[in-house]
Regions:
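N-terminally biased helix-coil "hinge/interface" segments that flank
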Residues: 1-405
Length: 405
């Protein structure tokens, strides 16, 4: 029987296939236009290595697990959904933070003009002080829709002790906008994501979840259907950032945030134990982000209130650290002729110059090929041919000449 583990990043998708103690690895390019394509490509390449058909392999697969850093990359590159946010009256500028300055990073995901307030109040014990009015909710909703919101996040004060007003918002919106609700417009409640105290952290959590939702969830069900259509009898299991896996139906977008690096920490801990190492640093270099993990005395650590690219949230995660520098990061010269690398990444398309998919700007991968750090005869199955190597060298030479100007 087979086990299949696949990780999709912003540039490459990697597969680990095992059968009866034998394992093989695969690397293919991520397909940002449709992530189910690179998932299928990875499975096809894995089947080839075992000299079986895709259907025969999937029919004999006990478990297929999937992890991704797409959520991380979406936040780093600020390419998520346009969302609207509804908060309690008086908290539009602070988002419940003690110091309004703490809320500034959140406005990069949901600008102030996409935030609306409703007049309601629930005290710290869950008692309703001011009742939420229907007209107030629908007026806010309509304004946000008119502003182009593709998803609505609702985070009201003290909803962790009494979510009644948040649930009322969702019910009113569903009744008033059934086509939006069931179709292109989604409604997320902070109380459904977290029941932990801390209105600011819950607000950040629901904003991040709504922001990265479309980049992930829209294709997870399609991926599972594609696998089933090829005789896979078991559900697709999606990796979560706390270290476990769950079915697609039980997965929220924020659960997948940094799930690839998180499971990498668990895997590194297992290898460390096998070789007698109890203190391990893990390094996961992707195409858009670099992620670090730490194992001390054989134990990986959890953060119950982690920070996601500067946003304190209230969902448990294995502790990892992300930086916007990786193999696809683009090098450039600033106004003072200083070398800068990242955070912009070439991704899988147009990709680094050496991929010959339209990329024209030098990346870390191009530099690695020129320096001999990456073997073009091995990387990506040898698809970096001599012509592509020459292109990378010419681009790096041209770029380096800028230092002499």
């Amino acid at each position: 029987m087979f086990t299949i583990d696949i990780d999709t990043g912003g540039t490459c998708t990697d597969g680990f296939f095992s059968r009866d103690g034998e394992f093989k690895t695969v690397k293919v390019l991520t397909t940002p236009h449709d992530l189910t394509v690179c998932l299928a490509d990875c499975v096809k390449e894995g089947a080839k290595l075992f000299d079986v058909s895709v259907r025969d392999m999937l029919a004999a697969t006990d478990v297929i697990r999937y992890s991704t850093t797409i959520g991380v990359n979406t936040l780093i590159t600020k390419t998520g959904s346009k969302i609207g946010l509804i908060v309690s009256k008086g908290f539009k500028d602070s988002l419940y933070a003690d110091d309004p300055k703490e809320a500034e990073p959140v406005f990069s995901l949901v600008p102030k003009e996409m935030i609306d307030e409703v007049h309601e109040d629930i005290d710290d014990r869950g008692n309703i002080i001011t009742t939420l009015e229907k007209e107030d909710v629908l007026d806010s909703m309509q304004r946000l829709i008119d502003m182009g919101a593709r998803a609505i996040a609702v985070s009201l004060r003290n909803s962790h002790v009494n979510p009644a007003h948040e649930r009322k918002c969702k019910s009113l919106i569903k009744d008033q906008y059934p086509n939006y609700y069931l179709g292109s417009l989604r409604v997320f409640l902070a109380s459904e994501i977290s029941d932990q105290p801390g209105d600011f952290q819950r607000t950040n959590t629901i904003v991040v979840n709504g922001y990265i939702h479309d980049a992930l969830v829209k294709y997870l069900y399609k991926a599972e259907d594609d696998l089933r259509n090829n005789f896979c009898a078991h559900p697709l299991m999606v990796a979560h950032s706390y270290g476990g896996v769950a079915r697609v139906a039980k997965t929220r977008a924020i659960d997948t945030y940094s799930s690839g690096p998180a499971l990498g920490v668990i895997g590194a801990g297992t290898l460390g134990e096998m070789y007698g190492f109890s203190n391990v640093i893990t390094v996961d270099i992707g195409g858009t982000s670099l992620d670090l993990g730490l194992i001390r005395d054989g134990v990986h650590h959890y953060d119950m209130n982690p920070s996601i690219t500067g946003f304190p949230v209230s969902v448990p995660m294995i502790t990892t650290y992300s930086a916007p520098i990786a193999s696809g990061s683009i090098a450039r010269l600033d106004g003072s002729n200083n070398l800068k690398v990242g955070p912009k990444s070439a991704g899988a398309r147009p990709g680094p110059v050496c991929f010959n998919l339209g990329g024209m700007e030098p990346t870390v991968t191009d530099a690695d090929v020129v320096l001999g750090i990456i073997d073009p005869d091995y990387f990506l199955g040898g698809r970096i041919n001599k012509d592509r190597l020459t292109m990378a060298i010419d681009t790096i030479d041209s770029f380096a000449g800028g230092f002499e100007d």
